[in-house]
Amino acid sequence: FLDKNPDGGVIFFESESAITKEIIEDRDIDSSRMVVMPVTTVQEFRHQAITVLDKYIEQKKSERKPILLILDSLGMLSTTKEMEDTQAGKETRDMTRAQIVKAAFRVLTLKLGKAKVPLVITNHTYDVIGSMFPQKEMGGGSGLKYAASSIVYLSRKKEKDGTEIIGNIIHCKNYKSRLTKENKVVDVRLTYDKGLDRYYGLLDLALKYC
């Protein structure tokens, strides 16, 4: 995104306390074009994201610079009620979280579309119990599933050079898409020393179709 938009920027909503300026710069990303905003609850993320979008929409279209919003991750976000219950020593589960997530994305989807700003979200998955064939499902209820234009499920296997583990092969299944064919699987390679290999698999395609 930053390569294709030299005047653009990224706002990174971070709930896992895992991103630092050093990590960003070690991956050859210009940290001056990336703002990291810590969030702890769904409500806090919703408020901050809406504030960013409202200020962006207030600008004249000719003055708007491209921005990308990222949330990592939805699965780690608590709720205000859960935080209050934990502080009070209660062990009750917050049964309203799915409704809060759904309400948040009802509002955000409209504002993102109006502003023409993309939002990328990472989330946790779990195995659905009780079906004959185990299936993966996203956490947080159905709100994000209905709001998203594309959903990609990721799984991985170790990539080895002899006996040494050098990275991972990541299986990317296009679970939902309004833009392309669904249920297609693409493998990408992520090595520890070089990062994402953008050319992985192209040779196999050339040999298959040429």
List the model feature ranges, each with a label.
Residues F1-D3:
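A conserved segment at the C-terminal end of the G1
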Residues N5-R93, Q99, A103:
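Conserved inter-motif catalytic segment of the P-loop NTP-binding fold
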Residues D94-Y209:
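Phosphate-binding/switch region of NTP-binding enzymes
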